[in-house]
Amino acid sequence: RGTMGEVDEARSETDQVRSERFPASDVVSRIQRLEQLEITPQRTAFRRVAAEVRSIIEGLTSTSTDAEALDAMADDLAKIAGVLAAHPKGRVYEGFAELANAGRLTADNPEVQALAAEMYATFDHSPFIGLANPLSPPMSLHLHDDEVTGSVTFGSAYECPPGNVHGGYVAAVFDELLGSTQGLSGAQGMTAYLHIDYRSPTPLHTELTMRAWIHDRVDRKIWVRGTIHDDERLTAECEGLFISMQPGKFKQLLNDRADAEQN
């Protein structure tokens, strides 16, 4: 396929040409499904807890608090961990809105088979776009007719080198960004490769803008390209190849996970 040196050429395509190559897809993306999730009291509480833990992580990576105060914090956190340990385990996102019970029942649920929004509730726990995951920066993504745009601000927990985002997190952001974009091709798949060019440092505590679009599709192969900018400065660009899943593969993944958790 084309090299990253062709990104400018790909970006210069008119919207009309790209619309002709990749007409509006019936595949509904994870972005749309997340927007359609019912905001239940439990989901709201999860997101609130995640936001507070995210704040703790950020504060802990940049504090100069003394040992006594840190020990007191650790004691408080241990109590919270104990409360969590006392509650039942499970994939809570499989039970939102009384959709399903767990595991294989989720996979067999007709709403899941019909690609209902709740099937995508797992993405609310994504480490990059999930508001219910404290590890998430989080990224904010927006779906358009022929591209996905978004923004993200990384805190101190993602630092390396000094003052900048660790390259591994930049790569993971691209995986999420391009993975959310591939549905514009008319199919959804799994990551085969990511080719990343780091053009300049990606700063912390700065709102970064992202953009991704479909570059090509041949049979089950989907090529997606994307960029990250700090204002007008390009910090990184990426090409990813995704292989669309065979029918029934997602359901099989759910079944396999359910079997593993029962053993």
Language-model features: locations:
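Short, structured beta-strand/loop micro-motifs enriched in basic residues and often containing a Trp
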Residues: 189-193
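Active-site helix/loop of acyl-thioester processing domains in fatty-acid/polyketide metabolism
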Residues: 35, 141-147, 165-188
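Catalytic strand-loop segment that frames the active site of acyl-thioester-processing enzymes
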Residues: 41-59, 128-164
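N-terminal acidic, proline/glycine-rich, low-complexity intrinsically disordered segments
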Residues: 1-16
